[in-house]
Design a protein with these regions (language model features):
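N-terminal hydrophobic targeting signals that begin at the initiator methionine
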Residues: 1-2
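Residue-level recognition of alpha-helix boundary/capping or hinge positions
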Residues: 7, 13-16, 111, 128-132
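Bacterial Sec-dependent N-terminal signal peptides
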Residues: 5, 10-36, 143
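Amphipathic hydrophobic-ligand
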Residues: 49-55, 97-104, 131-138
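Contiguous, well-ordered beta-strand patches that form the walls/edges
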Residues: 62-115
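Edge beta-strand at a domain terminus
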Residues: 75-76, 115-143
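Tryptophan-anchored aromatic micro-motifs
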Residues: 27-52, 140
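Generic short beta-strand segments
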Residues: 36-43, 90-93, 115-124
Length: 143
């Protein structure tokens, strides 16, 4: 029984943050969390549909402004996020002999609102010409 108690105590101390979890070297991360709203979808420049009540969650990687995106609409799921919003730099998440995908995007934070723009271009590997495009845009509210 003493060993079980000791193990429990060690786990509690090992898992504690040792300080205020809202503050770190880069400042307050309260802007991270879950945002929900409607997203308009455009394929090859033409409106396709609206995703109602879509949810995206931004989770800090090791208490930094580097985050994982849960529920992203493109394959790229990492970005930087600060008090102004997020940026997904140009990324090639998939390549085949015929094409590759180029993704990028951003989100502008204004209070509890996050206005997003996400892009995915399908590019011919031989010619470099764009074969198809996807564009997602909308305003999400922090929940």
């Amino acid at each position: 029984m003493k060993k079980l108690f000791l193990l429990s105590a060690l786990l509690i101390f090992a898992c504690s943050s040792g300080g205020d979890s809202d503050n770190n070297e880069i400042g307050n991360l309260e802007y991270l969390g879950t945002y929900r709203g409607n997203i308009d979808v455009f394929l090859n420049g033409t409106y396709h549909s609206t995703l109602n009540n879509h949810q995206m969650t931004f989770v800090s990687i090791q208490n930094s402004n580097q985050v994982n995106i849960i529920g992203n609409l493109i394959m790229t799921s990492n970005c930087t996020f600060d008090q102004d919003g997020f940026v997904i730099p140009e990324t090639i998440p998939v390549t085949t002999e015929l094409f590759y995908a180029l993704e990028y995007g951003s989100g502008i934070l204004n209070g509890n609102s996050l206005e997003i723009e996400l892009y995915q271009d399908q590019i011919n590997s031989t010619t470099g010409n764009v074969q198809g495009t996807g564009f997602w845009t909308g305003t999400l509210e922090k929940i």
